[in-house]
Amino acid sequence: MGSCAYINEPEFDRPGKPYGEGYEIFKSIYDKRPDIMLWLGDNIYLREGDWNTRTGIYHRYTHTRSLPELQPLLASTHHYAICDDHDYGPNDCDGSFWNKEMTLEAFKLFWGNPSYGIGTMRGAITQFQWGDAEFFLLDDRYYRTPQGRKTIEGTILGKEQFDWLINALTASQATFKFIVIGGQVLNPLPVYETYANYPQEHQRLIETITKEGISGVMFLTGDRHFTELSKLERAGTYPLYELTCSPLTSGVFAGAASEANPLRVPGTLVQERNFALLKFSGTRGDRVLTISVHDKTGKELWTRSI
């Protein structure tokens, strides 16, 4: 799994040093022979010349998908994806983006998810199960209100998607229930686009999972251009974990070490291009999730078991 895959195209890129590099990471992932590849958003980077036209949007997808280093991975395993702002439109875009239906249409054509929305609910939303792990893939853009709205309670998921998520989690019989969403959830700091910028909905999500007694929940997120594992202790029940994994080939956020996320598990901050593996083991009733994070060459940087 990974997020933030920027593929250079000089004619459309910013001047100076190319933003994307380290494409060999895709071969390193391929060499691990994963059963599935989970793309955590910003899987493409729409440029200013792309997001206003169908031609531009489809060019960006085909340009990214044509990368030679990507071909073995694309052809060798199952792929599931969520979207984030750069898949949808401009940087930090929200549900007000005028062309979101066209970018959603392109997402549907280039990703083979089981569904794109649930019933009449629109967006890049779906779920799938792999063994005793179930994945709930959310859309954090389609219903999102702009940060800083003052006359309404802001939302990332919207009521319909929020209610569906809680119902689906409650109904799930899976040992591991992964909530997959672009931006960080547990980090309590309201920085950039973390869920903490939407405090009412953020609190309601954590409280509802706790009050409903939903077992086995963990968050998988991208976006931040660094990797870390966060752990939220909860009174009387198991802790919630969040694995943030980023970037694949985009630039690295140099300020991550000084961002004092109080929930960060010591020794898990990674400030280089990387990907993560999730491995499941153990007998029924005694299952273990092992997380390992690897650099662009495939070298293991850290591992933790939950």
Predicted regions and their residues:
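Metal-dependent phosphoester/phosphodiester hydrolase catalytic core
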Residues: M1-I306
